[in-house]
């Protein structure tokens, strides 16, 4: 057990996400003591029998990951276009077998890519540079969010990151209500995978009004995934990249970085953000 924070184990409900191992510490190199590490395994997504992508991920919440990935990558537009899903655990990793509608599978074969990435990587193996940034439909302006309500959400973020609190090794993605409460969240060793899990959960729960908060930086792919799923506001704890800002500007997504209590850097479309408690 992590001797510094044994209480954190009470919040880890899925023991497959972390494992205790004997380790040496700088202050005592002669003996080992148990500490917790996050699990990381290869997860293959297979559509209608054809391997599409291999991601390094935390081995939990895999069905909603597959749903979120399928939605955020534009493979499907609705969960109704997925007819079935099986998760196969093997010696070398995990395979998620997804059955698509025939129309969606035909479209997927036309633009099929096959990649084996680093943790959460979604670019490695893309066949053409033009495939990196997909065309995105402009998002509507249907909601606002109070920056004052963001502070409360930031304080709650650790509640959806128990493995991260225990190991210091995961990213989190959370769905914020307009009131600044966290409706739900997911964590993973890969920031893209954490976001895909959240987007899959959002589709299942039919969350509409609100925003996404991620514990990581905002890359272009995080923006692309969020926008593809119709998310209008994306908050990141760390910075955004130039390509992320360009993509967000083009698709009308409100992108905010350095989201910390009492501060934030707004990169694009600030008109969705308001000062003061929206409920006041």
From Swiss-Prot:
InterPro entries: Cytidine_deaminase-like (IPR016193), FdhD (IPR003786). Mo-bis(molybdopterin guanine dinucleotide) binds at residues 258-263. HAMAP family: FdhD. The keyword Repressor does not apply. It is found in: Cytoplasm. Required for formate dehydrogenase (FDH) activity. Acts as a sulfur carrier protein that transfers sulfur from IscS to the molybdenum cofactor prior to its insertion into FDH. It comes from Cronobacter sakazakii (strain ATCC BAA-894). GO terms for molecular function: sulfur carrier activity; sulfurtransferase activity. The active site is at 121 (cysteine persulfide intermediate). This is Sulfur carrier protein FdhD. GO terms for cellular component: cytoplasm. One of its GO terms (biological process) is Mo-molybdopterin cofactor biosynthetic process. Keywords: Cytoplasm, Molybdenum cofactor biosynthesis. PANTHER family: FORMATE DEHYDROGENASE, SULFUR CARRIER PROTEIN FDHD. Belongs to the FdhD family. The gene is fdhD. Pfam families: FdhD-NarQ. The keyword Glycoprotein does not apply.
